[in-house]
Amino acid sequence: MALRWGIVSVGLISSDFTAVLQTLPRSEHQVVAVAARDLSRAKEFAQKHDIPKAYGSYEELAKDPNVEVAYVGTQHPQHKAAVMLCLAAGKAVLCEKPMGVNAAEVREMVTEARSRGLFLMEAIWTRFFPASEALRSVLAQGTLGDLRVARAEFGKNLTHVPRAVDWAQAGGALLDLGIYCVQFISMVFGGQKPEKISVMGRRHETGVDDTVTVLLQYPGEVHGSFTCSITAQLSNTASVSGTKGMAQLLNPCWCPTELVVKGEHKEFLLPPVPKNCNFDNGAGMSYEAKHVRECLRKGLKESPVIPLVESELLADILEEVRRAIGVTFPQDKH
């Protein structure tokens, strides 16, 4: 039976996700509705993607009985309101990362989903790429020996993107790029809570975080470190090292297709790319979409690959890092 999707917001990421859904078998995935805060934009999006219903408010989509799961692709500060609206209407939700601007927002969404017995997942698409799955297998098999350190970098000059430097929209490196680094390190170390976090960073002239380096100390004297930046080009790779060798996800590590394990290079081809994708390796969104369908058809309320407790942990870490360099957003409760 097809999973019936409703798309909340009509931005670039929503366009890519919708295009990818429509490359999948219609017997498994169908986009039945789209909503924007402007009906004309929703209708334009619906026409472009051949979606039967267009709504001029998120409330209308949430109330549509034909929508089974909502994909929330709004900008960061609008995530919580849209997610809460959809959950209140009884919908399962896949919410773009970061799920919330801060940990309090994430906990509020998680509490709501659990109290209503509804599925909620943060769309950390990286974890569902075959290269990431292969890395998890390598770690599970102990191929690298006793783990010692994980390292990730994600940086590019995004100062030409208004949202990336917009303080009011919770811009900056950490929430846009750093979350990919943190989730990698967390995945490597099994979702453990770090014992200590050390931070160095600089703020952008607009008040958002510009370039940040973080050291995470974990139980068992292992550690992870990452650097993220919206002004500097970095290697955009992620690696984990142990007593028997190293594994590395090559650039682009946030949507990886290449994995090197102890010098052995493996490439994982992506599905065909839909026309006019806005983001690198956009076709890889199909993996998370398939995972959501599998979870819902099994009756699961959260993903075993990115459980809600880990979404809460990632939010805790990112918030602590932000506060350490003096970056707070309007959404933060003081």
From Swiss-Prot:
Keywords (A to Z) from UniProt: NADP, Oxidoreductase
Tissues where this protein is expressed: Kidney.
Residue(s) at site: May play an important role in catalytic activity: Y180
Recorded GO MF terms: D-xylose 1-dehydrogenase (NADP+) activity; nucleotide binding; trans-1,2-dihydrobenzene-1,2-diol dehydrogenase activity
Documented EC number(s): 1.3.1.20, 1.1.1.179
Short name of any one Pfam family annotated for the protein: GFO_IDH_MocA_C3
Reactions listed under catalytic activity: (1R,2R)-1,2-dihydrobenzene-1,2-diol + NADP(+) = catechol + NADPH + H(+); D-xylose + NADP(+) = D-xylono-1,5-lactone + NADPH + H(+)
Keyword Oxidoreductase: yes
Family matches, as InterPro entries: Gfo/Idh/MocA-like_OxRdtase_N, Gfo/Idh/MocA_domain, GFO_IDH_MocA-like_dom, NAD(P)-bd_dom_sf
Enzyme class: oxidoreductase
Domain of life of the native organism: Eukaryota
Site location (May play an important role for the adaptation of the alcohol substrate into the binding site): D176
Site (May play an important role in coenzyme binding): residue numbering on this chain: Y71, H79, K97
Family stated for the protein in its record: Belongs to the Gfo/Idh/MocA family.
PANTHER family, per the entry: OXIDOREDUCTASES, TRANS-1,2-DIHYDROBENZENE-1,2-DIOL DEHYDROGENASE
Self-association state and partner proteins as the record states: Homodimer.
This protein's name: Trans-1,2-dihydrobenzene-1,2-diol dehydrogenase
